């Protein structure tokens, strides 16, 4: 028995970063397992994540999941919630495991800050922001968010798919390293994000 992460956040209010870390680590373990079997979820959002009574978290609703090698794009029948879709999903392009990573990054962002990275008056306006905007850094909203955890979140949410984590396992490794040392400064991510900013017009 349990409730969705969406319900949990609504009841709990603002989540502590440590709890957010606990949840996202379990989410990425689930995605890493699915991706290792060639399965992409395509609709990662708090409504599809279950928080069980024992504090464990399960990724649910693989109803629109597809095999990674299937030539699938975003269709009318397979739309993820617009607040969590990746830029490539918004463009209707071919997607892979990195699209799930982007959506998981949005979920982490929402847990850390208590708000979504992009809001708008319509689904189209939100989708456009995923394509062209950079969200506020979590620490600009919540000063207690550790810099290393913020960097993990922002790398997962890179609009450029090639700047994102290459796999759920890679993101999970950084999360596990951070869990061991919350003072860890993931400098290599900072450099990658800086390079991205320098190359953007």
Regions found by a protein language model. Give the residues of each.
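AlphaC helix of the protein kinase catalytic domain
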Residues: 4-15
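C-terminal lobe helix-coil module of Hanks-type protein kinase domains
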Residues: 50, 81-188
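Protein kinase catalytic-loop region centered on the HRD/HxD motif
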Residues: 29-39
């Amino acid at each position: 028995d349990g409730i969705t992460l969406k319900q949990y956040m609504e009841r709990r209010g603002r989540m502590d970063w440590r709890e957010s870390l606990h949840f996202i680590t379990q989410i990425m373990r689930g995605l890493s397992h699915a991706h290792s079997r060639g399965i992409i979820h395509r609709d990662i959002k708090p409504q599809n994540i279950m928080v069980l009574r024992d504090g464990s978290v399960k990724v649910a609703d693989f109803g629109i999941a597809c095999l990674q090698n299937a030539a699938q794009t975003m269709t009318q029948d397979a739309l993820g919630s617009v607040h969590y879709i990746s830029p490539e999903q918004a463009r209707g392009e071919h997607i892979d495991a990195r699209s799930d990573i982007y959506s998981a990054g949005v979920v982490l962002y929402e847990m850390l800050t208590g708000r979504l990275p992009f809001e708008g008056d319509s689904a189209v306006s939100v989708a456009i922001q995923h394509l062209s905007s950079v969200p506020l850094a979590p620490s600009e909203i919540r000063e207690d968010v550790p810099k290393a955890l913020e960097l993990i979140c922002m790398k997962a949410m890179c609009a450029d798919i090639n700047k994102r984590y290459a796999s759920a396992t890679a993101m999970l490794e950084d999360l596990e390293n951070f869990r061991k040392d919350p003072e860890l400064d993931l400098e290599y991510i900072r450099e990658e994000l800086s390079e991205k900013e320098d190359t953007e017009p």
